[in-house]
């Protein structure tokens, strides 16, 4: 069984990778504005939506079979880890890396902002004991009253959810990013309860060549809460 990828539009390739607990439908609100200029690849990440659970090598191989020689990639939250790793491993095919409410390392460490390890461990424990309630609360935290209907999403099974959390806990791409030379942008929401705004200050110091944008009134989903501003930024940086 292969990855579920929806392809829309025409023009330069633009790959969208969603966050934990969601699937490709989270991006549908942007399609009408972009499909006249770009070919959009809306990907269900492994274990989410209609894509089967698979490891990184299989995901990468399957995805690249569907993509043209060159593409820009947009990753939101956990999808930013996938987007970054893809760009880091095949920079010759990546034109732009564009991460939203994401971080190369999600867990808090000394001199690095992120999710407290204890909070993360408790979340994982709750997911095992009560997956439905746990993911509902997590989705509510991300949406924060945004105009978005989660009921259309396919609820992932607990194994897939736990696999995604393992990626969030274990992947650390900070060192590799030091050597990444392609155009890169990180967007943050000042009100984000998941990816702390302090991440931006640390990244600006460590990766001064990247572009950074802070949405002062956005939380974890600026592409929904500030759609027009997000689209303007995206298109201006892709020119």
Predicted regions and their residues:
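Conserved acidic catalytic loop of the alpha/beta-hydrolase fold
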Residues: 57-71
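Conserved alpha/beta-hydrolase catalytic His-Asp/Glu region
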Residues: 128-178
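Conserved HGGG/HGGXW glycine-rich cap/lid loop of the alpha/beta-hydrolase fold
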Residues: 4-52
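Short beta-strand/loop motif that positions the catalytic acidic residue
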Residues: 180, 186-188, 192
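Catalytic histidine-centered segment of alpha/beta-hydrolase-like enzymes
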Residues: 218-231
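Gly/Ala-rich beta-loop-alpha elbow adjacent to hydrolase catalytic centers
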Residues: 75-79, 83
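Conserved alpha/beta-hydrolase "acid-adjacent" motif
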Residues: 193-199
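Flexible "cap/lid" loop of the alpha/beta hydrolase fold
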Residues: 88-89, 94-126, 163
